[in-house]
Curated annotation (Swiss-Prot):
Phenotype of gene-disrupted mutants: Period lengthening of various circadian output rhythms and affected central clock gene expression. Derepressed expression of circadian-regulated and cold-responsive genes. Delayed flowering under long days conditions, and slightly in short days. Increased freezing tolerance.
InterPro entries per record: COR27/28
The keyword Repressor belongs to this UniProt entry's keyword annotation: yes
Subcellular location, record wording: Nucleus
Name this polypeptide is given: Cold-regulated protein 27
Intrachain disulfide bonds: none
Taxonomic lineage of the native organism: Eukaryota, Viridiplantae, Streptophyta, Embryophyta, Tracheophyta
Length: 246
């Protein structure tokens, strides 16, 4: 009897221990599963995706546009100056001109803002100016107009060949320059003709002098060839013979 009781008690105790161990294992397994699920959930929430990246870019663009319109509304704002004097009679308050650095060059662009964004996106006035090295506020210069007379003054311009013409004041200077150039050209041509004529005269004089010198040398040579040289003693002897004969 005692042996049977001990066997039953030990088997019951073993079964209780096994139940407790299984409960502990299941609880540990549940805790690990829940921790793994929470960790995976946190990882999935903090993971950076393309969708989040696009949303981030859109939010940055929206904030930049808000700052731009707010700065446009605050630039040049003065309560004592009316809108007509600020923007001119031909321009609207919702239009501004800027210089933007694009491809290495400053370019002028016209920025038009809607009526509901003149005072900001949400209707609030912002006095913070947009300070960016890529954008410069551009104010157009006032163009001065030169008065042009309806009836230009007529001037008479004479050319080098004696012809006269009537021209307006706008083209008189150009015609004067042309006439001066033609006059200079005529003077140069006349000077060249004089120089060429002088060269021909000198050459003719030189030719005549050369020919006269040649004639003189020929005549002298002919006279020298006809004359004969007689010694003095022969001449005296000839005279004595003539006297004796006579």
């Amino acid at each position: 009897m005692v042996g049977d009781y001990r066997g039953r008690f030990s088997s019951r105790r073993f079964s209780d221990d096994s139940d407790d161990s299984s409960d502990d294992a299941s609880s540990v397994e549940g805790e690990t599963t829940s921790s793994m699920y929470s960790a995976g959930k946190e990882y999935m929430e903090t993971e950076w995706t393309n969708e989040k990246h696009s949303l981030y870019l859109k939010s940055m663009e929206a904030s930049f546009v808000d700052q731009l319109y707010n700065s446009l509304g605050a630039l040049g704002k003065n309560e004592n100056v009316s809108e007509s004097t600020r923007f001119g009679s031909g321009r609207k308050p919702s239009q501004e001109q800027f210089k933007v650095l694009h491809d290495g060059f400053w370019q002028k662009i016209n920025v038009k803002q809607p009526e509901h964004r003149i005072n900001g996106r949400h209707g609030g006035n912002s006095h913070e100016f947009l300070r960016s090295p890529w954008i410069k506020h551009y104010k157009p210069l006032v163009k001065t107009q030169i008065p042009v007379t309806d009836e230009p003054e007529n001037q008479v311009v004479s050319s080098s060949n004696g012809k006269k013409g009537i021209c307006s004041s706008g083209s008189a200077s150009s015609l004067k320059q042309l006439s001066s150039h033609s006059r200079d050209h005529d003077q140069i041509s006349v000077g060249e003709a004089e120089v060429s004529d002088q060269n021909f005269v000198n050459e003719g004089i030189k030719g005549e002098n050369g020919s006269s010198k040649k004639m003189k040398t020929v005549m002298m040579s002919e006279s020298s060839s006809t004359d004969q040289v007689v010694p003095l003693n022969k001449l005296l002897q000839h005279d004595v013979n003539l006297k004796s004969v006579s």
